[in-house]
Amino acid sequence: MGELSEPPNGHVKNSVSWQTAHLKTRPKHFSTDILIAGGGLGGVAAALGALRRGRHVFLTEEYDWLGGQLTSQAVPPDEHTWVEQFGVTRSYRALRDGIRQYYRDNYPLTEEARRRAQLNPGAGHVSKLCHEPRVAVAVIEAMLMPFIGSGLLTVKKRVKAVSCEMVGQVVRSVEFRKLDDGGTFTVDAKYVIDATELGDLLPITKTPYVTGFESRKDTGEPSAPEEAQPQNSQAVSICFAVDHIEGEDHTIPKPERYDHWRSCHPDFWGAPLLGLKAPHPRTLEIVEREFTPNPNDDPASVISDQRKSGGDMNLWTFRRIAAKDNFIPGVYRSDICLVNWPMIDYFEKPIIDVSEAELQERLAEAASLSYSMLYYLQTDCPRADGKGTGYPGLRLRGDITGTEHGLAMAPYVRESRRIEAITTVVEQDLSLDVRGSKGAVHYPDSVGVGMYRIDLHPSTGGDNYIDVACYPFEIPLGALIPVERPNLLAASKNIGTTHITNGCYRLHPVEWNIGEAAGLLAAHCLDKELSPHEVRGKKQLFQEFQDMIIREGIETEWPDVSGY
């Protein structure tokens, strides 16, 4: 069959018009049972929880991909030692199992890798399941697809909340702006869940919240300062993926601010920011990391166990998301390394409660730091093989992160606005040093569990790492419920933690558990015609709710395990 001739101009015009004519008639007002703003891990889990209970859900997301820190932010999952056995929800385990099965069904794995029960596609040291972000996107979409087909779930991407309508203390509706064309629409909802990365709904709804570092006077935390520091937040990072093709030159143009970042020498860093030296998070000793692309290690021999080691001394394998030797020879020319390292932590200025112009300017600075680190690796980094400086074969893999600019689609946000909650989790609830042999505090209103060391990155207030060993902990329902706003729930890093305890509640499986509990709570309140405060406040009502979430696959307490 020959090439198609160009159709008449009128046909071209009509072919465009039928695709765009409906835009003027698209609805600008929606109603739903539960509105979830933010399609990160907390938002997705909240949606799944509510949908399984038969509720209509409207889910919005600022970026093209659902999944937040796991996908658009490109961060492989930070998980605890026992993740393969217990300590996560049933649906989070389904997500993990789905990712592994996706590789087995669609990737040319070696037979040995395919048979491995605990397949780690990237053989990264940070997690037992390091993988390419697109795979998680596909699995999340598949988990939600039946509910879209049934009409229970509506998803709107590339939108952001801009205003709301309140009736007394109740959030009646939220208005969203479309990022592509500037249009707006409004969603009425009986319950509203804030699962955004920065707690966007809190200032919009005038829900009382906290930012930055609380004072010791307010929280009693031993690691807190004497005075509150509301502008002192953890660094944000814009991650990126690279591979390395020896003999080729993929050097990017020199970033405009490269000289600035090359000369940056933070007082507490003990070395230039761009380099292989940085403080050790647990000891603060200045340690030089290894960087050797494609070390040809055996993927099956990699041990990923945060209890034994953070895994970050070898930067290439730390967060590697594709180990080429897991795949049939010749398919991958190189491993793929995900760069989320101390050297790209942007801690010059905060990004919370600033103007939109300031936010974009600071994120641009964070991006320039990431590009500069890549350029340093390509040109100035001392080579481990002694062959001078620079690895020009390092290739930026924007195709892996879904962007033309090459970096991750979204910034990796470690800290959010946090609600003034019924319950605030504090350091002394779970710190090994404070608790001694007693284990973490048991919350009678537990709706989940989590575990990670309290891990705070350098901050905009000039603080170095704060790294505190802790016990496996519980998630109190009271931390998801604001003191005010009876139909608003928190479902991400915006729950009732502190600057310090957010450092262990912000990780992937914990955020998922928080979101799932929030979605189940909203659905339960609608089913029983109760408020969240009533469910938590009366023992019998809470027990009924807790029994339900346990049946839904949420673990609410730990077996006898030790902290680290």
Task: Label the predicted regions.
Residues 4-18, 25, 69, 157-158, ...:
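Flavin (FAD/FMN)-binding glycine-rich loop and adjacent Rossmann-like elements that form
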Residues 43:
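N-terminal Rossmann-fold NAD(P) dinucleotide-binding loop
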Residues 46-51, 518-522:
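Small-residue (primarily alanine) positions within well-ordered alpha-helices
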Residues 32, 54, 189-190:
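Short, well-ordered alpha-helix to beta-strand connector turns
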Residues 35-37, 46, 165, 169, ...:
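Membrane-embedded transmembrane-helix bundle of lipid-linked glycan/lipid transferases
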Residues 2-14, 23, 49, 55-56, ...:
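Conserved N-terminal/central alpha/beta ligand/cofactor-binding core
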Residues 28-40:
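Beta1/beta-strand and adjacent pyrophosphate-binding region of the FAD-binding site
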